[in-house]
Amino acid sequence: MSNDRYKSIEHRVVANGSKDRVSVPIFMNPRADAILGPLPEVLESGEQPLYKEVVYSDYFKYHLSKKHEGKKTMEPKYSDTTVKAISTVSSVLSKLCDSYISSNQYAPRDPNSEKIIDFVVNKRNGVKGLVDAGIQTVPELYILPVDERLEPNKILTTDSIPVIDVSNWDDPVVTESICEAAGKWGFFQIINHGVPLEVLDAVKEAAHRFFGLPSEERSKYWAGNSPTETVALKTSFVPQAETVLEWKDNLSFRCSPRDLESFPLWPPVCRDEVVKYMESAEPVIRKLLEVLLKGLKVEEIDEAREYTLMASPLVNLNYYPRCPDPDLTAGVGPHSDISTITLLLQDDSGGLYVRATDEDSWIHVPPVNGALVINMGDILQIMSNDRYRSIEHRVVANGSKDRVSVLIFVNPGADAIFGPLPEVLESGEQPLYKEVVYSDYFKYFFSKRHEGKKTMEFARI
C-alpha cells in the first residue's frame, strides 16, 4: 500500500535447546474480499505503482500454498500500470493448491483480455462499462467453451417448477407442497406472499437507477473502495479465479441489524428501496423457514438456531446489460447457492434455468408477475441430510434489453457451525456431511469459479 515506503522485512525464529518457548502474534489482516494495492494518495504525484491490485484472499492462499520462501509472496512487482495476466495467478494457485482451487481448464488470457480485465475490474467499469463504450461483439474473455453453453436441445419444455399460493400458511396443503417442492425440485415460486407489488416494483426500478448512474458514480461503491464494507459493487463472480467472465455486475448489501447502521453510506438512489424490500420480505423468510424446519421435525426455531439459519442476510441487485451475442456467454454460470434459502425477484425478461431431475437438461423458470422464486441453498441441504435439494441453476444473457433481478440470500452467521440436524439423525440415520463453520464454507465457494455443486464436497463425509 505504501509502494515500498514502508518495508515488510524477513524474519525467522530459532529453536530453543533449553526450554519451551511461546509467543503470541496478532496479525492485523484485511477482510478476505478486500482489494489492496498502492494507495492513491501515494501515487497522486505521478509516481508509478510497483504492485498491481490484489484480492487479499488470493494473496493469503498463495502465501499458504508453499513453504516459507523469504519475500517471494510479494513477487512479481510491476514497474508500469499495465495489469499483468490475472490468469497467471489462477494457474499458479491451481498447481500449488489443487485441493483448494479448481483446475484451470481454459487457455491463458490473450493481451486483449488483459486490457478488458484492466478496464472492467481494475478501472471499476464492470461489464456495464463495456456496453456503454459501444462494443459490438462479445470479447474473448466472456466467450464460453462450446460444451458449457446452454444449447436449445438441453432445455426441457415438458416440466416446470411448482407455483404455490401461500395466502394461507396454515393450510396443510400449502406446507406439504412447500416441503415436497424443496425435496423434489429445490425450487418453487410463491404467490400471494404478502410483499406488496409496489415494493417489488420499486426495488427493481431502484436497481435500474443505480446501474444507470455514470461509471464514476457507480465505482464509488466498488468492493475495496466503498465507503462501507456493507455495500459492494462487483462484476462477474470471482474475476481473479475465472478465465471466462460472467456477463453480470451486482451491488451487494449486507442487511443484518448491525450492518444497517451504515445505511447513510449506501447509495441514495436505491438504499430506501432495498431496506423496504428486506423489511417486507422478512416475515416471508421466517414463515418459509418455519415450514421447512417443521418438515425436518424441528418444532421451534430458537435464538441459537435462528443465528445458524438467517443471521447474515445479503441483498444483491444483479444487472445483466444487453449482450451483443448472448448465446456465446453466461449471465451466471451453473452453481448452487451457499445460503440457507434464497429469494429471487425476477423482472419480465426471463433467463433463469434450473437443473432438471434427469441431470442433463435445464428447465426455464418463467417470470410470474408478483411472484418470488424460492430455492434451497447448500446449507439447508446439508442440515436436512439431503432431504431438501440445493439445485444448480444458471442465467443466460439477454440480447434485446437490460435485465435486473433482486436476490435475498438468507445466510448463517459467519461463525455459525452447521451440519445435519440432530432431529434428522435421531432415528439412527448416518450423517452425509461433517460439521462446518460457515465462514470456511463461504471462503471456499469464493475461491474458485462457479462449478456446479462442487462446493458441497467441502462438507461431505
Which positions does each model-derived feature cover?
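Peripheral, non-catalytic segments flanking oxidoreductase cores
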Residues: 1-461
